[in-house]
Design a protein with these regions (language model features):
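Non-catalytic structural scaffold of enzyme domains
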Residues: 1-279
Length: 279
């Protein structure tokens, strides 16, 4: 028996910081009628260099908090959490916490479309250290498209640059160029580049500037949204458990005013933010 309410509720979106706001934005563009709760564990961000166990523990706490807030379905809008915690939560925790609830990630929806996008069959992944070390993209892509070669490069400075509101500085330009040059040097045949961290679309103008025109750049928001739409279509029982009033609540583990200010980098609208502690 579940310890949580079985009443219909909002869709939860979790990220270690602000990057998941790009996922939430993509989802709301396609599915505006649903209710959402966004939870950012900003006080403990970034997750990229943390161990598998720590990321799992933090992500589990966040998922439980969203369940307690009424969410029947939670999207891990964080690549590191999707890479390091999703499987354990799906296989070990959900059967005990509530077998009817669902937790989905952002890596699988991206992997599903890659084989349709690349012509050279050479794909690059720019992501956090944790996501690259997990080999999650390589495993998921090659499970679906075994003829695709995947090259991954960690970009450890990109998230701090974005969260410090320095995306438009010469320093950002320098570090973006350095990583792109490196990945294209490793595999010059890459024709599709995945932004494997939900923060990275903020750097899109700089990334596009340094990537050859024939290389397409894949940001995740659109594909995660389409995947969620398809999931709800295929699971009408879950779709009926998601409320629809077009509302959004924002929760953060840090100072709400700081979150409100920094969220403007990612979404151009005024947000009301509540503080929450994860235990």
């Amino acid at each position: 028996m579940s310890q949580y309410s079985q009443q219909p509720g909002p869709i939860g979106v979790f990220d270690s910081g602000y990057g998941g706001l790009t996922i939430l934005h993509g989802i709301r563009q396609l599915l505006p009628d649903y209710d959402y709760i966004y939870l950012g564990d900003n006080a403990r961000a970034p997750y990229g260099s943390r161990s598998f166990d720590v990321v799992y523990q933090f992500t589990r706490q966040a998922v439980m908090t969203l369940f307690e807030s009424g969410c029947q379905l939670v999207i891990l809008g964080c690549n590191t959490a999707s890479a390091k915690a999703l499987r354990s939560i799906q296989q070990n925790d959900l059967p005990k916490l509530d077998p009817q609830r669902r937790v989905l990630g952002v890596i699988r929806p991206t992997a599903e479309v890659i084989g349709k996008l690349t012509h050279s069959r050479h794909v690059g992944v720019l992501a956090t250290e944790g996501t690259i070390k997990s080999h999650s993209y390589k495993l998921e892509i090659q499970k679906l498209w075994n003829d695709v070669t995947v090259t991954g490069i960690p970009c450890p400075l990109w998230v701090p640059i974005i969260e410090n509101n320095e995306a438009d500085t010469p320093g950002a330009d320098y570090f973006v160029k350095k990583r792109i040059d490196l990945i294209l040097e490793r595999d010059p045949q890459i024709d599709t580049l995945i932004l494997g961290c939900t923060h990275y679309p903020i750097l899109m103008p700089k990334i596009r500037k340094h990537v050859p025109e024939n290389v397409q750049i894949v940001a995740q928001g659109e594909y995660v949204a389409k995947s969620l739409q398809d999931y709800l279509r295929r699971h009408p029982d879950m779709e009926q458990r998601c409320t629809k009033h077009g509302t959004v609540r924002y929760l953060t583990t840090e100072n709400p005013e700081k979150f409100k200010e920094n969220a403007q980098i990612f979404i151009h609208e005024e947000v009301n933010v509540e503080h929450v502690d994860l235990e």
